[in-house]
């Protein structure tokens, strides 16, 4: 295989080097955060809590006002019919995944993942005793025939998907595949765990989540505001039927018995006064420019080595590499050129290897993107025996 068998977590590699350009999974640029608005909202929350002697801990499901604001946002922007009692706040997406796994999964239950998928989600379910089954996928989404075959062979408990912007390939699942998946879920009675990455869409035709469908009682939906707010205020949320949400909340209490009331009150203010929407709109314009730049540079500088389709949503691009590229050597050469990327095997099941990489670009400014692509070009060309320096 051209792909190395092991890879250090991308979050640990050269992150401290100020001159090292790291293309990540697709996070936002923390330098664009509305720091004044955030600090003002936190100050308001602290003052309110002190004056009214409100405990620093809140309900296991989260602050009621925040849950109401989230419900209104989801129903207005994502076409859902969420009720406050169906929404639970969580400190992070990873904690949400683990709570869902602990709630839904019993030892040796079968859970389906795409062959290329979120590795941390895979680990969360495996840690809770799940047997992981891998399913193929293409440019329309999951292979429905493959899934139905698994349903015949095994008693499937759940499937994990990110249909809006598949991690890592960036593909959006087609409407037809979504309908077929919903039908299979109803027929074979398994849960759909929908991880919705919808914060930044560059088209006017963003698809609605599967949880917005009328028959979505078997869908557990999770999303996050951290994609918009970055690390300034980490918050994720789960939307599920009330009985499952109650069980998730019990698990969350065991993991994090001190839900951050200050942060949740601050986020509520930012949602209600429109600051989060304004920040998202401002950021989208900047990310659109960065998206156009990296697409232009990839076409101009790396077209002989890669193939890609520019996605309509998300903040990353999936690059399929030429068969002649040795991934292990490319990583080493890129490291020498002070540029990093996330290779396929970080996301791949053990039996599925593809020579590709994911380039998250939004956290980099235009100068950093340009420098990073130039350095990547050097790394690619070194495989041809050409020595260039960025």
Predicted regions and their residues:
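N-terminal basic, amphipathic alpha-helical segments
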Residues: 1-43, 249, 253-259, 269, ...
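Short glycine-rich anion-binding loops that position phosphate/pyrophosphate groups of nucleotides
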Residues: 28, 163-166, 227
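Conserved core of the PLP fold type I
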Residues: 47-188, 193, 200-214, 287, ...
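PLP-dependent aminotransferase class I/II
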Residues: 220-300, 308-309
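AMP-binding (ANL) adenylation modules
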Residues: 347-351
């Amino acid at each position: 295989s051209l792909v190395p068998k092991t890879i250090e977590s991308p979050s640990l590699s050269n992150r401290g080097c100020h001159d090292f350009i790291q293309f990540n999974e697709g996070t936002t640029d923390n330098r664009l955060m509305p720091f004044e608005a955030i600090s003002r909202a936190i100050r308001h929350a602290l003052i309110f809590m002190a004056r009214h002697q409100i405990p620093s801990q809140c309900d296991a499901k989260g602050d009621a006002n925040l849950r109401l604001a989230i419900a209104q946002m989801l129903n207005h922007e994502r076409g859902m019919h969420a009720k406050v009692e169906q929404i639970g706040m969580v400190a992070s997406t990873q904690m949400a995944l683990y709570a869902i796994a602990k709630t839904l999964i019993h030892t040796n239950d079968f859970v389906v993942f795409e062959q290329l998928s979120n590795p941390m989600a895979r680990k969360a379910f495996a840690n809770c005793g799940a047997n992981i089954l891998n399913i193929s996928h293409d440019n329309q989404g999951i292979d429905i025939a493959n899934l139905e075959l698994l349903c015949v062979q095994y008693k499937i408990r759940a499937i994990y998907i990110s249909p809006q912007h598949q991690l890592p390939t960036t593909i959006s699942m087609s409407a037809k595949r979504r309908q077929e998946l919903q039908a299979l879920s109803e027929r074979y009675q398994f849960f759909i765990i929908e991880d919705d990455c919808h914060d930044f869409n560059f088209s006017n035709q963003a698809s609605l989540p599967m949880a917005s469908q009328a028959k979505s009682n078997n869908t557990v939906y999770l999303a996050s505001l951290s994609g918009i707010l970055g690390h300034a205020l980490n918050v994720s949320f789960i939307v599920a039927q009330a009985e499952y949400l109650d069980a998730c909340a019990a698990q969350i209490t065991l993991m994090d018995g001190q839900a951050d009331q200050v942060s949740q009150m601050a986020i509520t203010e930012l949602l209600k006064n429109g600051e989060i929407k304004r920040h998202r709109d401002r950021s989208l314009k900047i990310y659109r420019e960065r998206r156009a730049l990296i697409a232009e540079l990839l076409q101009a500088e790396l077209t002989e080595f890669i193939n890609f389709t520019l996605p309509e949503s998300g903040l990353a691009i999936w690059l399929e590499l030429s068969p002649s590229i040795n991934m292990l050597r490319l990583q080493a050469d890129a490291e020498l050129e002070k540029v990093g990327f996330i290779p396929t095997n970080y996301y791949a099941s053990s039996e599925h290897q593809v020579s590709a990489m994911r380039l998250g670009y939004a956290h980099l400014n235009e100068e950093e993107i340009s420098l990073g692509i130039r350095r990547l070009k050097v790394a690619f060309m070194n495989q041809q025996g050409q020595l260039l320096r960025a």
